[in-house]
Amino acid sequence: MKTLTVHTPSHSYPIFIGNGLLPQAGSLLKPHLGKRAAIITNETVAPLYLGTLQTALDAAGVSHFSIILPDGEAHKNWQTLNLIFDGLMQNRAERKTTLIALGGGVIGDMVGFAAATYQRGAPFIQIPTTLLSQVDSSVGGKTAINHPLGKNMIGAFYQPQAVLADLDTLHTLPARELSAGMAEVIKYGALGDIGFFEWLEQHMPELMTLERAPLTQAVYRCCQMKADIVAQDETEQGIRAWLNLGHTFGHAVEAEMGYGVWLHGEAVAAGCVLAARLSEQLGKTSAADTARLAALLEAAGLPSAPPVFAFEKWLAHMSHDKKVSGGIMRFIGLNRLGEAVITEITDTDILRRTLQPYL
């Protein structure tokens, strides 16, 4: 097992990474749990892992109840959030009841937002079961639900008490979900660590077959990079925005196609290539870097191009992006592979040229 600590102005918390951790969850998480916990999961994850977690909590002497939600990005909304609140209140959850998010990014984001707002703040713990959530969304305290006009538009910064990433849960992940998670892994190398990017180019076949040593190293490195960035910029006033590489274009794809049609990681993959193309238009990164990024994404079974839709629709979706400031769109681009940069765009003709092959 590998561990690291996330340090933020609000508080510090551990991340546990390894195999076979879920049966040990009671003992590992006991210092971060109250006397009672609410396990919140979905219909897909519950049959696989809920029983193991319940047994682990029983062994640690932690009482618990469970709330099982519908699965999928399409359910990341007010209606499902209210199902969480219904379950908490029906079970008389108190402010000190620990909410445990058992699932992927959708569960983690919603449970975190529920924790941030239930009785003005309850503790919560992340137990991510997908690659995407283990390397990205479970760490750093971003919580949210979607709105029909934009992804993750309603939420809060609210840090967990701990994160437990059991890599064994990835063995039940569909191949498409594994690829989607790998988009976020590749993103880290592209935005801030060329050495890691080159390592991914060498080890992608082993990663896609979930070989234990390289997988542990990849998840650890991603969490380490995110922890370092979050420690410097908890509420995304500066460099934390780098973590949104590919997300402005990607969120537009998700919103246009309908949440869940393209998986988040698939949209981010195409978005990363578009961000590199935009950087080319601005005279920053090279066409060779863009091609190299696209090739690595394709090696992970990911799309390197977005679906085709009208430029006006792209603009409409991107105008709702959370990075828009003073009406000016802000994109995360690349100076070169391994070096992200925040770019303000006032000339939409540059965006049109970037997107022209997909209009």
From Swiss-Prot:
GO terms for biological process: amino acid biosynthetic process; aromatic amino acid family biosynthetic process; chorismate biosynthetic process. Its cofactor is NAD(+); Co(2+); Zn(2+). The keyword Transferase does not apply. Binds 1 divalent metal cation per subunit. Can use either Co(2+) or Zn(2+). Gene3D superfamilies: 3.40.50.1970, Dehydroquinate synthase-like - alpha domain (1.20.1090.10). It is found in: Cytoplasm. It is an enzyme of class 4 (lyase). Pathway: Metabolic intermediate biosynthesis; chorismate biosynthesis; chorismate from D-erythrose 4-phosphate and phosphoenolpyruvate: step 2/7. The keyword Lipid metabolism does not apply. Keywords: Amino-acid biosynthesis, Aromatic amino acid biosynthesis, Cobalt, Cytoplasm, Lyase, Metal-binding, NAD, Nucleotide-binding, Zinc. One of its GO terms (cellular component) is cytoplasm. NAD(+) binds at residues 71-76, 105-109, 129-130, 142, 151, 169-172. GO terms for molecular function: 3-dehydroquinate synthase activity; metal ion binding; nucleotide binding. It catalyses: 7-phospho-2-dehydro-3-deoxy-D-arabino-heptonate = 3-dehydroquinate + phosphate. Its main location: cytoplasm. HAMAP family: DHQ_synthase (MF_00110). Belongs to the sugar phosphate cyclases superfamily. Dehydroquinate synthase family. Catalyzes the conversion of 3-deoxy-D-arabino-heptulosonate 7-phosphate (DAHP) to dehydroquinate (DHQ). This is 3-dehydroquinate synthase. The gene is aroB.
